[in-house]
């Protein structure tokens, strides 16, 4: 299979390129500055030149708080940009796997299934949902939406590394971590084979997140336990950490599609990540 990865230099994209190569697939990557997904003509030309069998669309505006102030710009990238990739994929006759987020849900009534009602509570979620809908509108016969959550991996800034950095600071005896948000920590390493599997499934919406769920505080405690970090984790509230963008309380993604890939328990994936980083 020849794959095109748009956004291949990011945390997920780097792992996906490695995974595709390891599985014997031909993989081509495009990212800024060589592609601007908001430029439709350029996207169509670049995808056509790559002549892929499948397009993995990972490029996105991912600054959740920044999107509150710059929703128009975020919408241009996450909405129109995704539409452009869908149009280009359609014209190239390639399957499209577009990565989306748990933030398309309001976070008040999870866990959420693939067909649960969407109702994002922040600009970032609204722009990602717009991208989902525009891709399905332009290319219903070829678009697969893969929603994921709470990503961490070797090739980018992430919660696990940040917290271990804080926890190993000799001047600290504790860290305060939010305990009233619940989600599914997802390893980029585990997500990659799931995305490849989704490319072979019928068009539609798929949930691809770590098995089980926890709070940010629970996630941090397990990371500290595995990494043998001697630092107390104290529960705190979302309210105590005021941020521009509201966060969902419960954004647990449930897999109900029979043929959909199921990721292993988040604790097992985290154990591997901690082992590899030490």
Regions of interest found by a model, annotated:
Residues 3-21:
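N-terminal Rossmann NAD(P)H-binding glycine-rich loop of SDR-like oxidoreductase domains
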Residues 6, 30, 55-59, 96-101, ...:
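SDR active-site strand-loop-helix element
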Residues 21-45:
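Adenosine-cofactor binding site in Rossmann-like domains, unifying the SAM/SAH pocket
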Residues 40-77, 88-90:
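NAD(P)H-binding glycine-rich loop region in Rossmannoid oxidoreductase-like domains
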Residues 76-84, 104-146, 150-151:
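Catalytic helix-loop patch of NAD(P)-dependent Rossmann-fold dehydrogenases
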Residues 133-183, 188-190:
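NAD(P)-dependent short-chain dehydrogenase/reductase
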Residues 192-195, 200-244, 274-277:
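Mid/C-terminal beta-alpha module of Rossmann-like enzyme folds, strongest
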Residues 231, 246-278:
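C-terminal amphipathic/interface module of NAD(P)-dependent oxidoreductases
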